[in-house]
Amino acid sequence: MPLNYPIAEQTLDNGLRVVVSPDRGVPIVAVNLWYDVGSRHEPPGLTGFAHLFEHLMFQGSRNVRSGEHFALLEQAGASLNASTFFDRTNYYESLPSGGLDLALWLEADRMAYLLDAVNQENLDNQRDVVKEEKRQSYDNRPYGDSYERLVTIAFGENHPYGHMTIGSMADLDAATVEDVHAFFRKHYGPNNAVLTIVGDVAEEDAFMAAKRYFGHIPAIPQPPAAPDGSVGPITGVARDDVVEDVPSDLITMMFRLPADGTPELDAAALALDVLAAGQSSRLNRRLVREEQIAQSVSGGALPLVGGVSFGTLTGVAVDGADLRRVEDSILEEVEKLATDGITEDELGTVQAQNERDWLEQLATCAGRADELSHNALLFGDPGRINRRIDEVHAVTAEQVQQAAAEWVRADRRAQVTYRRAESTSSASFMSGAQL
């Protein structure tokens, strides 16, 4: 049975899509503003710009001083933040419903007038903030650069998904104020965004407020389409083997998967869940509980809309265990799933896990606003949130096996290993990437 969350949509004259889902359960309202720009939209030489704007958006606009966006909303009881991803950028806040007008005014002011505050001083300041973020989250954190390494060898640096949202520090260093202004004018306008309002507000009041604060903002020229990232499974095995000071030896594998919004992606995602989601997964039973060669295993799909998605499997070795044995055990289970398939019980378990996770996400105003925005922006269909459980339950065990045999294969993977220097042996891994 599909869910029945109320959803209403309007498009303003300037192209802003507005999605409203009233919920009078608690006096809270969630506001999400999603822009159709992420790292896959960045041309060569401009990597990291979408993420840079995630920071610049809080440095003031025409009518808001630097730092005041956070201060005003927090004074109104809000929690707020932003995130940048391959496919989109998201600005969001949840607050008592009496603060809705404040939240909308602040979002509209930076959509319309952000560039009034983007000067050389602010650019230099936020460029330094991003560099520090990269040092803390990527360079100086154990395994912090694993995804950066994986997407490079899984897609290649010229693919839309071949670089992380943090971007290239060389590109950011070379960026001028004029470059940054041009990127904003190209992507940050009402006709390239979705505004979602969920919570304690009447449908008509929400639409009127959206029009009041955003209706005057002119549309931008049609943004350029993101490059097509359509590509099939990885051919062969691409490796990057790293020796450095890490807490434990680790192996992580990446597989290209079908694009989001397809039954094939749902089936491949369920295959990865059977392998690595939860205590009852095949890899946890074998590597952690039975063979006791791994401290933990994890994995899953990362859905993307640009022609291809990807999924991962990761194992953290126990001290003294041979990482090659961890690798071999993972690959044996990968091949076994593709060859022998899964049981109906396994399918039912991972489908139930997905249903639970989905219901928990939609249970809060903030979570529902996030998913409505996601489906409105990337699929043009916010009502998909009510059908999503049925889509997952429609996948059969045969489809899971077919997807695994096509996409989740031992001979179609990118792989990064991290080993401590003391566990290095000449008989273990070759170093460097083999493309």
Predicted regions span which residues?
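Non-catalytic beta-strand/loop surface segments
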Residues: 1-39, 63-99, 137-192, 216-262, ...
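Short pre-active-site segment immediately N-terminal to the catalytic Zn-binding motif
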Residues: 38-46
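Active-site SXXK
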Residues: 48-61
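Short, polar/flexible loop-turn hinges at active-site or ligand-entry regions and domain interfaces
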Residues: 59-63, 112-121, 342-343
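Short amphipathic alpha-helices in soluble, non-transmembrane regions
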Residues: 105-110, 208-214, 326-332
